[in-house]
Swiss-Prot record:
Pathway: Metabolic intermediate biosynthesis; chorismate biosynthesis; chorismate from D-erythrose 4-phosphate and phosphoenolpyruvate: step 4/7. CDD domains: NAD_bind_Shikimate_DH. It comes from Methanococcoides burtonii (strain DSM 6242 / NBRC 107633 / OCM 468 / ACE-M). Its EC number is 1.1.1.25. This is Shikimate dehydrogenase (NADP(+)). InterPro entries: Aminoacid_DH-like_N_sf, NAD(P)-bd_dom_sf, SDH_C, Shikimate_DH, Shikimate_DH-bd_N, Shikimate_DH_fam, Shikm_DH/Glu-tRNA_Rdtase. The active site is at 66 (proton acceptor). The gene is aroE.
Length: 269
């Protein structure tokens, strides 16, 4: 019997998860299918119980359901710290995970950049920043967070423990002591062509990762190129967070190259 997987959210029409996961199932000749369903916050508990009752293999969650889901699932320790769920597995109850930070970590490691003991500066203090900050702290990075509202950055840093929070003006002094710069804000998304950091503030040993993947080469990454730094695009974070969910659900090694090719073709990159 065909196993069903899905992503839930509102809005959901934009999601690339169905085409990415269906390409993976097809590549491994698995009798599975992946769909997208619009689910509002107030309906999430019923949706989770319904999916479990109908024998779904697993779910992904996107905006605005990630935080709400904590009330209804058995979250693993990392997801509980992050305070958000993006992956649900039904093999043993309703288990919740967060693979966003893992997606970012694998993307950067793919570029040959080791995270342990590195000084990381994360721009933003929202959901993606939380996932990346906690995951990188667990991996042994020295985490720094800069946010438009410094209090939010300091609050997140305090939750992590061994981290520091600042206002965005921290970048004005230059990034000589930073090894990895990560943008988790929406600055640079779409046609905005904005950046929070310029080439003059960077150095050539810096790795610059932007989780925005549309456009692929954001203004921030263009500035990184100008500075002779290493630009890392956000597209593989999307692929790797999905690949980790695939691994959790199926126990199989996901076909990363197939998933990447499908996403890039869909985005016409």
């Amino acid at each position: 019997m065909k196993k069903i997987f899905a992503v839930l959210g509102d809005p959901i029409e934009h999601s690339l998860s169905p085409i990415m996961h269906n390409s993976a199932f097809e590549a491994l000749d698995m009798d599975c299918t992946y769909h997208a369903f619009r689910v509002e916050k107030n309906d999430l508990e019923n949706a989770l119980q319904g999916a479990k009752a109908m024998g779904f293999g697993g779910l992904n969650l996107t905006v605005p359901l990630k935080e709400t889901a904590l009330k209804f699932v058995d979250a693993d320790s990392l997801a509980a710290k992050i305070g958000a769920i993006n992956t649900i597995d039904f093999k043993d109850g309703i288990k919740g995970y967060n693979t966003d930070g893992i997606g970012a970590k694998r993307t950067i490691e793919d570029e040959g950049v080791d995270i342990k003991d590195k000084n990381v500066l994360i721009l933003g203090a929202g959901g993606a920043a939380r996932a990346i900050a906690f995951t990188f702290a667990e991996a042994g990075a020295n985490v720094n967070i800069a946010n438009r509202t410094p209090e939010r950055a300091m609050q997140l840093a305090a939750e992590i423990g061994d981290a520091k929070g600042y206002g965005l003006d921290i970048v004005d002094n230059g990034l000589e002591d930073i090894d990895i710069l990560i943008n988790t804000t929406t600055v640079g998304l779409g046609n905005s062509n904005g950046t929070l950091v310029t080439a003059e503030q960077m150095h050539s040993d810096l790795a610059v990762f932007d989780i925005v993947y549309n456009p692929l080469m954001t203004k921030l990454l263009q500035e990184a190129e100008t500075a002779g730094a290493r630009p890392i695009t956000g597209i593989m974070m999307l692929v790797y967070q999905g690949a980790e969910a695939f691994r959790i659900w199926t126990g199989k090694e996901p076909p990363i190259n197939v998933m990447k090719k499908t996403v890039m073709e869909t985005l016409d990159i």
